[in-house]
């Protein structure tokens, strides 16, 4: 019997949420701290499945760290160079793309014989474009099951040079190469093939690398030049900013049924592209207030939008359920990379939106959503995808309850999401 959670209709949301740390920032910072010279103290680290997978992998490789009781503060003793596995290892990385891709590249610099594997869904998430680029740089990588997909066996060997990487499927492939390249014996020139998706995530990578003392020459996101034989330097204390993708659910709830909801831990200067989700809510008719360390959203009469959402792929999912409460047909374009995430999010989203009564057209890289006259009760399948569960919680802002199957899947990035939502909610 699958776990489920039924949310009763919510009349009003109001209050403040202190956001958990960003997943994207947490896992990048952990890896860079592990590669750096010196000890780094990370605060507001996200405690979630994806981050635990990264921590477990680093420990297995021999990285020493200590965690606070609540797992949000981590002191990491850097290796001062590549990760070298002393004996053959198998690392289980769950469904954490932010651990699988960067670790695969980082382990191509060191010595060792490491197998990287994960949950069944991880074995369906493409990694061929990254492996192709690593092999061009001399890395020894083999596929253990299906060509172009994990599990992988990695045996080091990446020495730099010119490598071409396809940027059109996932920006994580480029992120992985960028973070590993400074430790290679030679300079690396990365050439991007195709249109680079999710550019703001590359900005997160470059900003974090700079925090740890390494600067990359970025030529308009077409080519990147990284000097070899560099060393990351520990940063004594680093505060992980709040997760902007996680903020999207609370800001959207306020736009639909506020009151006002204020999220803290991110603000106008945040490095995460997903803060621009708030701009979309504003275009739809909500009012948004920006502070240095907060974003606040207040209800407005919402109208449909037709937008390219390539720059905010994760937060854009939240617009799909917000569209249920907007006048007119909302169209979200240039979101092909939804298909290679935790599940095929385009198909999953279309399927579940139809259950609550919406009229949906699903294209190769777009979705259009016309809300029903009245939202109907449904049991929502979540496809072991944390964002499906959180997005569809917004259905409870209607006059109908909603049942979320497998609600615990939010543990991937936000274990206490439903408790936080309940804290802000006044039931009808």
Swiss-Prot record:
Give the superkingdom in one word. Bacteria
**Pathway, per Swiss-Prot/TrEMBL?**
Metabolic intermediate biosynthesis; chorismate biosynthesis; chorismate from D-erythrose 4-phosphate and phosphoenolpyruvate: step 6/7
Q: Which CDD domains match?
A: EPSP_synthase (cd01556)
> Where along the chain is phosphoenolpyruvate bound?
23, 97, 125, 172, 345, 387, 412
What SUPFAM superfamilies does the record point to?
EPT/RTPC-like
The Gene Ontology CC terms held by the record are: cytoplasm
Q: What is its main location?
A: cytoplasm
Alphabetized, the UniProt keywords read: Amino-acid biosynthesis, Aromatic amino acid biosynthesis, Cytoplasm, Transferase
Tagged with keyword Amino-acid biosynthesis: yes
Question: Which reactions are catalysed by this chain?
Answer: 3-phosphoshikimate + phosphoenolpyruvate = 5-O-(1-carboxyvinyl)-3-phosphoshikimate + phosphate
| Annotated InterPro entries | Enolpyruvate_Tfrase_dom, Enolpyruvate_Tfrase_sf, EPSP_synthase, EPSP_synthase_CS, RNA3'P_cycl/enolpyr_Trfase_a/b
Q: Name one GO molecular function term.
A: 3-phosphoshikimate 1-carboxyvinyltransferase activity
Q: Which residues form the active site?
A: 314
Task: List the residue ranges forming a coiled coil, or say none.
Answer: none
Q: Report disulfide bridges, numbered on this chain.
A: none
Question: Which residues of this UniProt protein bind 3-phosphoshikimate?
Answer: 23-24, 28, 170-172, 198, 314, 337, 341
Question: What is the annotated localization of this protein?
Answer: Cytoplasm
Quaternary structure and interacting proteins, as annotated:
Monomer.
Q: Which family does it belong to?
A: Belongs to the EPSP synthase family.
Question: What's this chain's function?
Answer: Catalyzes the transfer of the enolpyruvyl moiety of phosphoenolpyruvate (PEP) to the 5-hydroxyl of shikimate-3-phosphate (S3P) to produce enolpyruvyl shikimate-3-phosphate and inorganic phosphate.
NCBIfam families linked: aroA (TIGR01356)
**Known HAMAP family for this protein?**
EPSP_synth
Q: Which named protein is this?
A: 3-phosphoshikimate 1-carboxyvinyltransferase
**Which organism is this entry from?**
Erwinia tasmaniensis (strain DSM 17950 / CFBP 7177 / CIP 109463 / NCPPB 4357 / Et1/99)
């Amino acid at each position: 019997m699958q776990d489920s959670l039924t949310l009763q209709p919510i009349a009003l949301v109001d209050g403040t949420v202190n956001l958990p740390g960003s997943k994207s920032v947490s896992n990048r910072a952990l890896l860079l701290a592990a590669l750096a010279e010196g000890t780094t103290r990370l605060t507001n680290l996200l405690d979630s499945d994806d981050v635990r997978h990264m921590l477990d992998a680093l420990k297995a490789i021999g990285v020493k760290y200590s965690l606070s009781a609540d797992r949000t503060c981590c002191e990491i003793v850097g290796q001062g160079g590549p990760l070298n596995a002393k004996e053959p290892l198998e690392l289980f990385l769950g469904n954490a793309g932010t651990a699988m891709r960067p670790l695969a590249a980082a382990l191509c610099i060191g010595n060792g014989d490491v197998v990287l594997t994960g949950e069944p869904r991880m074995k369906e998430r493409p990694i061929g474009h990254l492996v192709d680029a690593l092999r061009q740089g001399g890395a020894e990588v083999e596929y253990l099951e299906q060509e172009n997909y994990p599990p992988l066996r990695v045996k080091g060997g990446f020495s730099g040079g010119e490598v071409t990487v396809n940027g059109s499927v996932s920006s994580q492939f480029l992120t992985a190469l960028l973070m590993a390249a400074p430790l290679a014996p030679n300079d690396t020139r990365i050439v991007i093939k195709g249109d680079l998706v999710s550019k703001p995530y590359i900005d997160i990578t470059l900003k974090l690398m700079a925090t740890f003392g390494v600067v990359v020459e970025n030529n308009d996101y077409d080519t990147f030049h990284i000097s070899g034989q560099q060393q990351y330097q520990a940063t004594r204390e680093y505060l992980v900013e709040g997760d902007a993708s996680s903020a999207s659910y609370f800001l959207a709830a306020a736009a639909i049924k506020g009151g006002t909801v204020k999220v803290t831990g991110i603000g106008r200067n945040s490095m995460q592209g997903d803060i621009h989700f708030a701009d979309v809510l504003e275009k739809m008719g909500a009012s948004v207030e920006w502070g240095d360390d907060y974003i606040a959203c207040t209800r407005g009469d919402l109208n449909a939008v037709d937008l390219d959402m390539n720059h905010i792929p994760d937060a854009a999912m939240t617009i799909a359920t917000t569209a249920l409460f907007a006048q007119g047909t909302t169209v979200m374009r240039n979101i092909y990379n939804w298909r290679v995430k935790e599940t095929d999010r385009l198909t999953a989203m279309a399927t579940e939106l139809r259950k609550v009564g919406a009229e949906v057209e699903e294209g190769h890289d777009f979705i259009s959503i016309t809300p029903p006259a009245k939202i109907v009760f449904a049991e929502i399948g979540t496809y072991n995808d944390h964002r499906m569960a959180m997005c569809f919680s917004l259905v409870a802002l209607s006059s109908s309850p909603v049942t979320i199957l497998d609600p615990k899947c939010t543990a991937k990035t936000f274990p206490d999401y439903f408790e936080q939502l309940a804290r802000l909610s006044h039931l009808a």
